């Protein structure tokens, strides 16, 4: 193990010990991804994991890798949340109805929370988890845009002094895989083939490299086709969608202001035609 990783492990454990005691009312948002598994192992090593409620938040698009992994973890409670019940944006109802129609007409991946992940994390979870004083996450600072808007440091202080604690916030991707190898940690089987999980495939921002798209195409061709249907639809109709859902900030940020990504996709599609 490198000295750099040893120092980061010490730092992460100290963050946990300095901000949590067994008397605290705490929970852990367990995603079944590699980062969550690492935090889970750190909590276990510190002998505090059994005192923390562990939740997997169901999105309606759980792949078999995640479902199989959850079966091996009876200590993790799976919960589903009605996003429309918690979201403040009145247009989410119109958005939901519109998407159901879009699914059928364009053979697009069906997910309950499609187009609302950012709202879901900031609005839904913040309300649902309000009863806890501390929420642990596996978020890292080099995570994607929508995650970084929710957690911006290893310790995020919320209203009434509630905390979001992300012990491995400063870890790199290399740190994570070194720790996993050193501790012989079992991951979701998707990591063996793809190197990531399929659970966020519904988000065009998540897989914004042609390399990732090629992996999806190789191992899950039907899923790839439906994902590309979504991307092409959003690209072709982005101006109309902006007019229709102009006040839904999360929708605009996630899909309509990302022209640089759609240009990449357009280029990729043109190559496929040749």
Question: What is each of the regions a protein language model found here?
Answer:
Residues 1-183:
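ATP-dependent adenylation/nucleotidyltransferase module used to activate substrates
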